[in-house]
From Swiss-Prot:
It comes from the Bacteria. The keyword Signal applies. Pathway: Glycan metabolism; bacterial cellulose biosynthesis. Required for maximal bacterial cellulose synthesis. The gene is bcsC. One of its GO terms (biological process) is cellulose biosynthetic process. The keyword Repeat applies. This is Putative cellulose synthase operon protein C.
Length: 1154
């Protein structure tokens, strides 16, 4: 157990001693250090003793061989030294020991000594770089030569630090070299490394050889310190290290004197102030020196130091005042050179400061005088010239500013303010010139205006993005906005622009996320709140916009935010009012608006409503009310202009339009209204010029109601001005601007598909779609081929009708309407006469009741009619013929004019139309040849008509028609008629693509004579003297993407009465022999009443964009009238149509039935 304990103790002791053993130098290291010490102290005996032992221990050590080499060389044994050098080259040819030894050997030769002497001469005469280049190739030998080499290197400013480090290394290796220590200490003091210098002197003082030198250098470093606590401490430190010598005596005397002086408070304050100034502590120096000056106002040194302290603090005015006093008190002071230099500097910078202040106060004349004054003080510094450049910039004298800034840079290429000034000048001239200037700058100059370079790049990207936005290339614009955001991360408005572009590109979720993230990053930033509010309100999220704005304390709201809030709140009120008005409650909507606080916007809305309902008096009064508050309100002036135009007072309208204030900042909407007014006043050229300027502006804007309205009305104007093709292109832009689509349509199918109605559309989108569709269809070329079969039962030979009509119509654009060419081929067959037992016709036709008729019993005829015409929204006319080939052919046609009075639409027309209800009335027939053989029939209605309608798009509608006609025909008794028809309908379902109605119709007819017979002189058309009917129609109309249909039915009750009329009303047509009999014959009158019904089905299908097919069937059954129809048609669209199907389908109507 004891043995175990001893072993543990031994092991522990061993472990404890191991670090000490490892840390201790080896015998070889100790002996080598003794060699270096002996060489440094010139003790050759110490060198030889150490080498003897080293060569026994480690004879092949390169450092040992090198030491022996140096020893032999010092003894003059060149051969022995060469042998050691050769041996060293074999042992360690790459070692520092060999390289150093080889250099030392070289210096022992005459050439080497001469090269060294030459290098020393170069170093002495100030050519240190050449000396170093010629010495040793950067690898000096050891010893005094190495010290001399690195001392020479230290004379090169760029390598002084390297040289000091090398000398410190040599000092560590050769601690007794007092010459080295002397040089190193002086180098450290001159490099302002005082603490390191004193440490070297303290090391040097430990050797007898170096102590006196160290004492002199140390005292020289502290003896001239200003009297202060620091100077006393420095003297005490010196005296604690050195105890004898002349310097010590002087230090002791100086210490006693300073301690005595510092006992005086005034002197102490002065001394501490002077010391603080020397240390650069102006804040501490100023109160101390002020105290000293108060104690002795004529103390020039204190005044000068106080001026210096103020200069250090940047207080140029006080610096100048105190320095001037110091120089005046003691013009011959040893400090005069310093004070004069400081005075010049502070006078210069005082003038610069005052010039900057004058420029900031917008007083360029005073600034110019001060900068010129500074320039007179010092014409070598660049800032006075820079100031003159700033004055020229303030005066917008850019050429002069450019010259001054360029002069500034010639004086000081590092003056970044001059670089910035030139960059701003060139930026104003053109971005390209600014970029070229920046590219010419040095790296440091370029870094100084990095913000301008980024801004230029940002501006360039912004312009490129805007150009892409104008072209509708939103995704590409967004990519550029991302680059802008990378240059200016967190920018509110770049984020806003990027989000808007993404939204338009269809990346709406990403756009919303960007704006939400911005709000989270800058929750209390008013600019962010304003931008996000704009973003939300611009995408129909007004309530969300208000909620976000209200998250910011009201005290932080900017004027822009308040204006946005007012607009959004006003929008909500106006939205509610507009809904009320659109639902027919205009009075209630007006009442709600009049309850709101006074608002120009609301007053203008009320005025606009009055104008739309043609209440010009109320509209004028409302607009004048606005102008009373705001005499230059453009909307009110334009409103009065529109009132005068609507009232037909063009002179007053022109006068009002001339009152518009001239401005370059008029809104798009104001300019749009001006253009419309110009167009309505007939100033087409002016309107064209206004729209030519407006339309590109609107295209360049992000989608908005304002830009969409400009493009919509611009397209209308272009169409009216005779450029429908361009108008259609503008409608495509209007679709983007109004939000119908985010991508501009590139082909007809896409474009026309976008014209389809959408229940979610606001009034603007709905209008853009509708107007674009109307113009597109007006410009399309259509060809329609239709076959119609119709007939009604009756008496064979004249009223048992079966008719076929084949119609071909071509519609094409002309002016602002559509012209058409029409041809109908008509075949009418009224069957065959019945006969009695004798083969005679048993019918009341022609003159067969006066003389029997027999022979060919069938009656039919055919012919072709042609017609041309034109129509637009207001006028319609046509001219054509009845079927050529019939017995009676005439020219027919009509003209009509349509307009509205408020919600009441009306159409007036004048016409000449055939009566086509029978072969006799339409085409005429020919009496039996053996009787008279005369043609008669072909009845035409010449007259006028008025149609009225009231339908505001709501649930109820009313229509009415009144017409009067003169009825004439070939060999037919003249007649006239008056017809009144009216109806009411209720829309059970009233949707864009589906409508179900039920109504009540009434008809009242009156014919002067009953000429419904088929005998010679009769007309063969239904002509009761009284006719009254009531009907209840039900109609279902619907359309889908490629189908459209109408299903209808009605039940009716009618009453009619006819008078007894002569069977042969025109006796001149009857042969004389038959007239007496003819006069006795008549057609009995009478009355009847009964119920009837109708059923109708109409269907159309879009097969392709260009081809459409349709069919219809119509069955009618009523008292005295029961025609039925069946038709098929095909229509071709040259341009193609993918818009809404017609609702209901629109087959051709036989020209005879117009």
């Amino acid at each position: 157990m004891r043995k175990f304990t001893l072993n543990i103790f031994t092991l522990s002791l061993g472990l404890a001693v191991m670090p000490m053993v490892e840390a201790a130098p080896t015998a070889q290291q100790q002996l080598l250090e003794q060699v270096r010490l002996g060489e440094a102290t010139h003790r050759e005996d110490l060198v030889q003793q150490s080498l003897y032992r080293l060569e026994l221990i480690d004879p092949n050590n390169p450092d040992v061989v090198a030491a022996r080499f140096r020893s032999l060389l010092r003894q003059g044994d060149i051969d022995g030294a060469q042998k050691q050098l050769d041996r060293l080259s074999q042992l360690a040819p790459s070692s520092n020991a060999y390289k150093s030894s080889r250099t030392t050997m070289l210096l022992s030769t005459p050439d080497g000594r001469q090269a060294l002497q030459q290098a020393r001469l170069q170093a002495t005469t100030g050519h240190a770089e050449e000396a170093v280049a010629n010495l040793f190739n950067g690898a000096p030998p050891e010893g005094d030569i190495a010290v001399e080499y690195w001392s020479t290197v230290a004379k090169i400013p760029a390598r002084r630090g390297e040289a000091i480090n090398q000398l410190k290394r040599i000092n560590a290796d050769e601690p007794g070299n007092t010459g080295l220590q002397n040089n190193l200490a002086l180098l450290l003091f001159s490099s302002d490394r005082r603490d390191e210098g004193f440490a070297v002197l303290e090391q040097m003082a430990k050797s007898n050889a170096g102590r006196e030198g160290a004492s002199k250098i140390w005292y020289g470093q502290i003896k001239d310190m200003p009297v202060s606590d620091a100077s006393v401490s420095a003297l005490k430190k010196y005296l604690s290290i050195f105890s004898d010598g002349d310097s010590v005596a002087a230090a002791q005397s100086q210490l006693a004197e300073q301690q005595k002086q510092l006992a005086d408070p005034a002197f102490r304050a002065r001394a501490q102030g002077l010391a603080a100034v020397d240390s650069g502590m102006a804040g501490k120096a100023i109160p101390e020196l002020q105290q000293a000056v108060r104690a002795n106002p004529k103390d020039s040194e204190a005044l000068g130091a106080l001026g210096q302290a103020y200069s250090q603090k940047g207080d140029r005015a006080n610096a100048v005042a105190n320095l001037e006093k110091a120089l005046a008190l003691d013009p011959h002071s040893s400090n005069n050179d310093k004070w004069n230099s400081l005075l010049k500097v502070n006078r210069y910078w005082l003038a610069i400061q005052q010039g900057d202040a004058a420029l900031k106060a917008n007083n360029p004349d005073r600034a110019e005088r001060l900068f010129q004054q500074a320039r007179n003080v010092d014409n070598t510094d660049s800032y006075a010239v820079l100031g003159l450049g700033d004055v020229a910039m303030a005066r917008k004298d850019y050429p002069a500013a450019e010259r001054y800034y360029q002069q500034t840079l010639r004086m000081d290429s590092g003056n970044t303010n001059a670089v910035r000034g030139l960059a701003n000048i060139y930026r104003q001239q053109s971005p390209e010139k600014a970029e070229a200037f920046i590219a010419s700058l040095s790296a440091s100059q370029r870094r100084s205006i990095d913000d301008i370079e980024r801004s230029l790049q940002n501006d360039r990207l912004a312009q490129q993005a805007e150009a892409l936005e104008n072209q509708g290339k939103w995704a590409q614009a967004a990519a550029l906005q991302r680059q802008r955001l990378a240059l200016d991360p967190g920018s509110v408005w770049i984020t806003y622009r990027l989000s808007q572009d993404l939204w338009q590109a269809g990346q709406r979720s990403q756009a919303d996320t960007l704006m939400r993230n911005l709000a989270q990053q800058k929750p209390n930033d008013p600019e962010q709140v304003y931008a996000y509010g704009l973003y939300l309100s611009g995408h129909d999220q007004d309530r969300a916009a208000l909620a976000h704005i209200n998250s910011l304390p009201r005290a932080q709201w900017s004027s822009n935010i308040q204006e946005l809030v007012n607009r959004l709140q006003s929008d909500q009120v106006l939205e509610t009012a507009n809904r009320l008005r659109e639902s027919g409650k205009e009075a209630e909507a007006e009442a709600m608006l009049r309850q709101q606080p006074p608002s120009t916007r609301i007053d203008l809305t009320l005025a606009d409503w009055a104008l739309q309902r043609r209440d010009y008096t109320a509209a004028r009064a409302a607009y004048q009310n606005v102008l009373t508050r705001e005499p230059t309100n453009a909307d009110a002036i334009l409103g009065l202009t529109e009132v005068d135009i609507a009232a037909g007072d063009t002179a007053a309208a022109r006068s009002q339009l001339a009152k518009l204030p001239a401005t370059d900042n008029a809104s798009l909407n104001t300019q749009r209204r001006v253009a419309l007014a110009q167009a309505q006043l007939g100033d087409t050229a002016a309107a064209q010029q206004t729209f030519n300027k407006l339309i590109p502006q609107a295209k360049s804007q992000p989608p908005s109601m304002e830009s969409a309205m400009v493009l919509r009305d611009g397209a209308k104007f272009e169409a009216q001005a005779g450029d429908p093709k361009q108008a259609l292109e503008t409608y495509k832009d209007a679709m983007v601007a109004s939000g119908v689509t985010t991508t501009r349509p590139q082909d007809n199918d896409t474009f026309t598909r976008l014209t389809r109605n959408d229940e979610k559309d606001d009034w603007l989108k709905r209008g853009v779609r509708s107007d674009a569709a109307d113009l597109y269809r007006q410009q399309d070329l259509n060809v329609t081929l239709e076959h119609d079969y119709w007939g009604s039962s009756g008496t064979g030979g004249y009223s048992d009708l079966k008719a076929h009509t084949t119609m071909l119509q071509v519609d094409a654009p002309y002016s602002d309407g559509r012209m058409f060419f029409r041809s109908d081929f008509v075949n009418m067959n009224v069957g065959s006469f019945s006969t009695n037992a004798d083969g005679k016709w048993d019918d009341n036709w022609g003159t067969c009741t006066l003389r029997d008729c027999s022979g060919n019993r069938s009656q039919s005829d055919s012919g072709a009619s042609v017609a041309v015409g034109w129509r637009n929204d207001v006028w319609s006319w046509d001219i054509g013929t009845t079927p050529m080939g019939f017995n009676v052919v005439d020219v027919v046609g009509g003209i009509s004019y349509s307009d509205d009075i408020g919600p009441l639409g009306y159409t007036v027309n004048a016409h000449r139309r055939p009566i086509s209800s029978s072969l006799l009335a339409f085409g005429g027939q020919k009496d039996f040849p053996s009787n008279t053989g005369k043609k008669w029939g072909g009845v035409r209605a010449d007259g006028v008509g008025l149609s009225l309608s009231y339908d505001k798009g709501e649930a109820n509608g009313v229509w009415a028609s009144l017409s009067g006609d003169q009825l004439t025909g070939k060999n037919v008794e003249d007649n006239w008629r008056v017809r009144w028809m009216t109806g009411y309908y209720y829309k059970v379902i009233n949707q864009n693509n589906r409508r179900v109605t039920i109504g009540l119709n009434n008809m009242i007819w009156h014919y002067d004579k009953d000429l419904s017979g088929y005998s010679l002189g009769q007309g063969g058309y239904y002509s009761p003297q009284e006719y009254l009917s009531f009907a209840i129609p039900v109609m279902w109309r619907e359309r889908t993407e490629n189908w459209s249909w109408e299903l209808g039915a009605s039940g009716s009750w009618s009453h009619s009465r006819t008078k007894t009329m002569p069977r042969y009303p025109l006796m001149n047509l009857i042969p004389t022999d038959w007239q007496e009999e003819a006069a006795r014959q008549s057609n009995d009158g009478g009355s009847s009443q009964g119920f009837g019904y109708t059923a109708r089905a109409l269907l159309e299908r879009r097969v392709t964009s260009n081809w459409f097919v349709g069919t219809a069937i119509d069955i009618q059954q009523a008292k005295d009238y029961a025609p039925s129809h069946f038709l098929l048609y095909v229509r071709y669209s040259a341009a193609g149509w993918q818009g809404d199907m017609d609702l209901p389908p629109q087959p051709l109507i036989p020209y005879a039935d117009w």
